[in-house]
Amino acid sequence: MTQISRFIGEVVPVAQRVTGDGGESAAPDGGGGFADYALVSLHCLRIYLDTSYRMTVDLLKEMPQITGEIGLDAADLPAPSTLCKAFDRISMSVCRVLLRQSAQLHDLSEHAAIDATFYDRSPASRHYCQRISYRVQKLKVTKLVDTASQAVLDVHCSTNREGSDADLAEQIARRNAGDLRSLAADKGYDKKSL
């Protein structure tokens, strides 16, 4: 069994449980869409392989065993654009569960650190943003990271700069309070209630 096969063998049951549609057929039947667990599994595999959407689909056409474990045939694979659009529709709650599942693969301490980072939008997508009147230029990502394993425990994404980092840190800390003994942060997170 290859590493990819072991990986997909772990991902598919988790994706089925998280999306709640494990009983559905992965491939679209009678004009329907792909099952959510199949699309989530394909995205996890794309990230694991560190490839583009197009390359992931091309590789999977040559891997019938892997596509079979997802419940698809090579002929049933979605187009790269379908896979890309499906990624935008995955809810944050599904992403958080997948993040938590991946963090459990590490030996976690009870100590974490929190910090925020801003990401600029890619210049390649500027034309698309102007065409649809999408004005987001920066994305603020706040991450909670285990200090021993460097595993990301939680993430919060925001497109606006309103509110303080301390308010957001309090929300993330409450969500993970049962798992933490200490939380480290820089002085931008200085708040009495935190």
Go through each PLM region and give its residues.
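Basic, short loop/linker segments at the boundary and entry of helix-turn-helix/winged-helix-like folds
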Residues: M1-Y48
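Short, surface-exposed helix-loop/turn micro-motifs enriched in polar/charged residues
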Residues: S52, G71-A75, D186
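Polybasic low-complexity intrinsically disordered regions
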Residues: G31-Y37, Y48, R54, D58, ...
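DNA-recognition alpha helix
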Residues: R54-L72
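Alpha-helix initiation and N-capping motif
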Residues: M1, S5, V12, Y53, ...
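Generic anion/oxyanion-binding catalytic loop in active/binding sites
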Residues: L45, L72, S158
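Major-groove recognition helix of helix-turn-helix-like DNA-binding domains
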Residues: E69-I90
